[in-house]
Amino acid sequence: MSLKILVPIKRVVDYAVKIRVKGDKSGVETANVKMSMNPFDEIAVEEAIRIKEKNLAKEIIAVSMGPKTSQETIRTAIAMGADKGIHVETTAELQPLSVAKLLKELVDKEKPNLIILGKQAIDDDCNQTAQMLAGLLNWPQATFASKVDIKDDSVHVTREIDGGLETLSMKLPAIISCDLRLNEPRYAKLQNIMKSKKAELKVETPESLNVDTNCNLKIISVEEPPKRSGGVKVESVENVVEALKKHALI
């Protein structure tokens, strides 16, 4: 079976950047900050490419939503090995349900039979889009995938659970969300990076997809975690035991 794979990706603050909270606590500073593809989505792109390299897929479509700068993230996916990209251009703050609704409309247009995406984005950690999209499409889903095997018209997904591993089998079409242990994403070759800059991207909008992106959730406050106090050196095991007793920990 030759698959058509849709891979949703998100542009986020780079994982190596030290996050700074805005003065009004409405969010984090993103101006003049290095941005990159969500790490979980990189894994999704890599897995789609590996499936294609096994001659199990004919096309990989990378999709991203957000302002025009999101096109850079799509081009990164193309440089890695995706075949084409779709940009849903919007400046609105998209919540998981809105993202899922937009993806559903794209699925109806593009007709993929496998969707692979990161289990969550590192900026909001919602971990909701895959599940919501599966509900809207009425497709089977396997979340937190650490191994993916495709046989005929079925997908076998191994996922880590408390105390062991769980393997699920699904009929296509299906949705998979990726965990960090699934694979290690490749670096794009320079020649592919240069080619991706000239790649033509298909542009949609929430309006062209007939999706209302009004927010039903409101962020009340974003705060930095409290700073950790320094540790105390102890001279012996007896002193450790005494300190634990003092704080009623034993």
Curated annotation (Swiss-Prot):
It is found in: Mitochondrion matrix. It holds the Pfam family ETF. SMART domains: ETF (SM00893). GO terms for molecular function: electron transfer activity. Its cofactor is FAD; AMP. Keywords: Electron transport, FAD, Flavoprotein, Mitochondrion, Transport. It comes from the Eukaryota. Binds 1 FAD per dimer. Signal peptide: none annotated. Its main location: mitochondrion. Heterodimer of an alpha and a beta subunit. Belongs to the ETF beta-subunit/FixA family. This is Electron transfer flavoprotein subunit beta.
